[in-house]
Each structure stands twice: as C-alpha cells, then as structure tokens.
Curated annotation (Swiss-Prot):
Belongs to the universal ribosomal protein uL3 family. Pfam families: Ribosomal_L3 (PF00297). GO terms for cellular component: cytosolic large ribosomal subunit. The modification N5-methylglutamine is found at Q153. GO terms for molecular function: rRNA binding; structural constituent of ribosome. It comes from Thioalkalivibrio sulfidiphilus (strain HL-EbGR7). It comes from the Bacteria. GO terms for biological process: translation. InterPro entries: Ribosomal_uL3 (IPR000597), Ribosomal_uL3_bac/org-type (IPR019927), Ribosomal_uL3_CS (IPR019926), Transl_B-barrel_sf (IPR009000). Methylated by PrmB. One of the primary rRNA binding proteins, it binds directly near the 3'-end of the 23S rRNA, where it nucleates assembly of the 50S subunit. Part of the 50S ribosomal subunit. Forms a cluster with proteins L14 and L19. The gene is rplC. This is Large ribosomal subunit protein uL3. The lineage of its organism: Bacteria, Pseudomonadati, Pseudomonadota, Gammaproteobacteria, Chromatiales.
Amino acid sequence: MAIGLVGRKLGMTRVFTEDGASLPVTVIEVDPNRVTQVKTEERDGYRALQVTTGARKASRVTKPRAGHFAKAGVEAGRGLWEFRLDGDQGAEIETGAELKVDIFEAGQIVDVTGISKGKGFQGVIKRHNFSMQDATHGNSLSHRAPGSIGQNQTPGRVFKGKKMAGHMGNERCTVQNLEVVRVDVERNLLLIKGAVPGSTGGNVLVRPGVKAKG
C-alpha cells in the first residue's frame, strides 16, 4: 500500500485541454490530513499511518476518541482512516504532521475508494445487468424476471452467491487507474478524470494506483 489522502467529493465538472478537448472531472476537496498515530510492527503488528481530516464539534466526539486526538496533539476530525505502509515507507512522518494535496501531481494514476450511492432494493436487470426476456410472443408475466435459479430435487437448493434481486449500492468500492488532471494546492482541490464512487459530500480515499504502469 501507499500513502494517500482522505478527501470530500464536491461533484463533477469539466475542463478543457489545450487542444480543446472536454474532459469530465470529479472535484475532490482534500483538506490537510493530520497524522493521529504512526502504527509500528513492534507495537501494533503492522505499519500504518492513521489520519484525520476536517473538524468536528467537541460535543460530537466521544471521550476515548477525544483523548486519542489530544494525545496526538491534533484537532478532532470527522473520522479516522489508515494507510498501510510497506518497508521503510513514511519513516520520516511523525504524529501531528500534516499531509497535503501536493503529494499528488498532474498526470499521476490513482485509485479512489468511497461508499457507492444506495439504490435500495433492485431487480436483477439493474443490479446484475441481466437481459430482459421477451416483451411479447406469449410472455406476459416474466419480462424482468431472472429466469431459472436452480435445478431440480438434486441439489434441491439455490446455490450460495446466486445473482438475484436484492439491496444494491451503499457499499465500499474502489475505482482504479484514474488520472489526476489538476492539483490546486491553494484551494486544496484534486481534479480527477472520470467518476468516483459516492454522493456529493461523501468521504473518499485517494491513493497512488496499485496497477499503475511505469
């Protein structure tokens, strides 16, 4: 894993390249991430950076977490996130340090993780991209039905993992290999090409792409 940043999705817009092409981009506000704990192999069993960002009223912070923030000497944030470290990565970073948007650069390939928009209970066509059955030719009840979901008395059950109707969305998911189009250090903004998971105002994790070439 690599050191990333926690940001907030502001929405989508577009930017124009020098040759006039229009690029759809997602705008992510990345306030400085404050390091609340540096986890070590000896004490915690693995190496990681724990960070927080944003602000939260003291009345909305639990006592254990308030003590954790106070021990780190940082302002209480809206949550805690971790970035696992490999080898000697992040050895120079100490508790209380700030990670800012300038750790990324234009043209870099990143992975973005967020909580997808909840869609409620959906059928197999929307949820699993099934094809519809015939609209006519004798079909009057099964236009959007999944079809067969099993066999006969043997095995006499529906196998686990069978794609069926159910709750869709509101899950943690990652979109990989997105390009950073622009880094606005003054306004703490990242402009990333394409769409990222989540609704406007949702928390997203931006990390260097694990499958990036080069």
